[in-house]
């Protein structure tokens, strides 16, 4: 599948499922163009607010950087000092932002599907960009992952991609398995069986990491999401690393052309050996870099939808 020129216009971006293949590829194309230095002048001043109700470094700060690069006005929001602490609902918070003239709200929230009430509201005019909804979806992370893969291989068709780790609790995994399958990749899963659900079988086969490490083009590691587990009393970092992580021994068995990805933050010496985070096959830092450019593309598409 190739990328062709095309203008992407979006009202909201809340899941990967709402995007057509053409829109996905168009956003990747714009991300690559921004990375190459392309400039864009918006037709007016647009205002964005980043509302993060869960901790974030990369998503939060890369959206801020994307907004700055597009010369958008940023309306500060800190959940710790907002009226949320007085009992204000998320819907009323966003209704307020809309009334103030905020054009785009980037939101991360622990509630899965939090965005549904917002995009269905007849009075909220601001566009919603989902920065992660609990263990639901993470579309902007998925798009930066796709951009990173496309830069490397120039296609998705026929690529063998393994998603390895804490799959059940990962919004990144859910977004990626759906879109990568749709774009023609062959998906495999690896990791503890207790963190895997049968519903994922429609996308790919669950195997031991040692059975797939030599054949995959992309090894996409996932963070162990301790904060979403009921209890980690029996969890051992050493055991996880030995059974499911990317060790130096497994790294040596990867194909010469294979790449290693991780959405970060990385639990070093758990999902991946500390020595491998910046190894030659690792694209973890590039993913972070691409996050700025693909989020510029997302914001531009939202602006296009308002023109």
Swiss-Prot record:
Catalytic activity: carbamoyl phosphate + L-aspartate = N-carbamoyl-L-aspartate + phosphate + H(+)
One example of a Gene Ontology biological process annotation: 'de novo' UMP biosynthetic process
PROSITE patterns recorded: CARBAMOYLTRANSFERASE
GO CC aspect terms: cytosol
Subunit relationships: Heterododecamer (2C3:3R2) of six catalytic PyrB chains organized as two trimers (C3), and six regulatory PyrI chains organized as three dimers (R2).
Purpose of the protein: Catalyzes the condensation of carbamoyl phosphate and aspartate to form carbamoyl aspartate and inorganic phosphate, the committed step in the de novo pyrimidine nucleotide biosynthesis pathway.
Family label: Belongs to the aspartate/ornithine carbamoyltransferase superfamily. ATCase family.
Protein name in the entry: Aspartate carbamoyltransferase catalytic subunit
Protein's organism: Streptococcus suis (strain 05ZYH33)
